[in-house]
Amino acid sequence: VGMAQEKEGVGSYKEYKDKILPRIKKAGYNAIQLMAIAEHPYYGSFGYHVSNFFAASSRFGTPEELKDLINAAHNMGIMVIMDLVHSHTVKNTYEGMYLFDGNENQYLLGGKEGHHPQWDSKLFDYGKIETLRFLLSNVRYWLEEYNFDGFRFDGVTSMLYKDHGIGTNFSEQSDYFGDNVNNEAVTYLQLANTLIHQLNKDYITIAEDVSGMPGICAPIEDGGIGFDYRLGMGLPDFWIKILKDQKEEDWNMHEFFFTMTNWLYDVKTI
């Protein structure tokens, strides 16, 4: 929302509704994904260091203006997907959840295990019933209070593996089903997908997973995690790298072919 406009400064929900939505409709799109909706202290984090999971970011306007944006999109036939960050939270103590009751372990993992080495943020303890209740109630809140049409779950790869998938090639079956898998996080994602689709079978869930976890979009009753779609990050990341780092005459057609075909054919991918 904030960066979707040409003016200097942060854009607002109202400006997005009035200026951007009509252009999206004219371009023929039927869905948008809104990022950085939940409140976050540092704008440069792109909304991924969430401090208040139940507050729409006030830097873009009021909750009512966000609801107006979503309603306007629906009136144009455009679905609105929220970028949902349940993979980690900001480490700030004053405005975040960390040390909320004086210790590390209320909803989060403690010590080194509870710190993400790349994101400099804190990690949820998905094995705690209190954490599950907090996150699941947050899922329901955004759907029922703001009328979002579903979620793109951020950082699913980080959630699925105890080492967060850092430095793993994911080339062997043991990479997906060994001791490194965070079974408690898998259970949470299954619960979240169950809740969402019980509330409305037309709600959409999308997993940002770069590992290619088998079954991520399979039905839960078949042993899957229950997402509707997987967000394929490999191709856009490849294009960005190619355009930034290589001259056109140096493009490798084998790399192009491999990247464009390297996906699971039974998984619906965006």
Where are these predicted regions, by residue range?
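Active-site-proximal beta-strand elements of phosphoester/diester hydrolases
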Residues: 1-2, 270
